[in-house]
Amino acid sequence: MKNNRITAIISLLLLTTSCVQKTYRKTVVFILQTNPIQSIEKVGIRGNDKPLNWDADLSMKTVVKDSLYKATVTFITGYKFTEVKFVVNDRIELQDKNNRKINFTATDTTIYNAKFDSTNP
């Protein structure tokens, strides 16, 4: 009976003490250059981590029409990076290429500058 009680206590302790990954609140300011594309109707961003996803665009705000767009996204994540792709007029960039990997800075906010469909900023 004593062994059963000890086994039960140990099992209970193992079940209630789990490894929980530390989460971080990280904000990324995405700045996207779209020139020379003309007649832009909508610009968005898709990605791995909430609030982004790969099925729908998060809209980016126009800074300069047909040229410069911006979005600020806050992630609550256990990772130190995220992956994204930009979308212009329903066209996803970097087809058949890796996603953009954004490494979060040590501070709370990361500024990420990009040029649409180019791996060179």
Label each region the model flagged.
Residues 80-84:
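Exposed beta-strand face motif in extracellular beta-rich ectodomains
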Residues 36-79, 89-107:
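Aromatic-rich carbohydrate-binding modules that target alpha-glucans
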Residues 9-13:
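Hydrophobic helical h-region of N-terminal Sec-dependent signal peptides
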Residues 1-7:
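Bacterial N-terminal signal peptides that target proteins for export
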Residues 16-18:
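C-terminal motif of bacterial Sec signal peptides marking the signal peptidase cleavage site
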